[in-house]
């Protein structure tokens, strides 16, 4: 769950939002809660950082993340940092950003990046450009030993068909999950990014069969080598 202090909260309401979030965090001890603070170049950043020290937070999301702001924020925090990459500079500085100690996972801010570049993500050309960003996030995450990045939101809150297509596309593109802009989107997105029972059964069976093998082997008519075994392990990990 992401508690947001940035775009969803107007400037006049940010102080009250911090108070409400602090009160909520005081009441929870085992919730997996991330806090999205305001960007480092805003007047709200340092006030948000004080709240970001709360011990019941699982992590902090830094919007408009670049290498310098990621490094400065990670130095202050005691919890994992999730940089939200949503600018051209953020993309260009990914090799440095992913290697900042404390960075847990990348998120992809497709809406803001599309706005900066003047892209229409509903058209093939705009989608193709955003895919180049996905490729960069995926490869840099892999090189740094981070989990697959989390994709941007689908703004169509009341269009389940569009949400399904967007989530399926994101899953096929190798992304590790997808942010939701509204709670009603969670169940559908989760169902797409969660392996099916058949996939889980296959993956566990492959892992079990591999225990007694020392090289490539055949399993249910399929050749299993190291890449296939890695896929099976990834499916099992996702199922958890």
Model-based region annotation:
Residues 1-240:
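Expand to "…catalyze enediolate/carbanion chemistry for C-C bond making/breaking, isomerization
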